[in-house]
């Protein structure tokens, strides 16, 4: 079973990476044309939401008691995979 602290650290690291990518994509949005800007803004909002969800999940994991962590590890890992899919979907719109 994955250790609680390792998973929380993984989530935090991923959210920091996403935060940096959001900044990069925001710069692209500012340089985009009017129509593209609207589409990019939607993607940016989705990306920001996913980064925030990852940070929130990291906090929940970090704050969980060991017994609770045993119960939530599977669901937390699945939630993280879904966050990654949502992130990839949003990023694909910038390609």
Which positions does each model-derived feature cover?
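Amphipathic alpha-helical membrane/lipid-surface binding segments
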Residues: 4-94
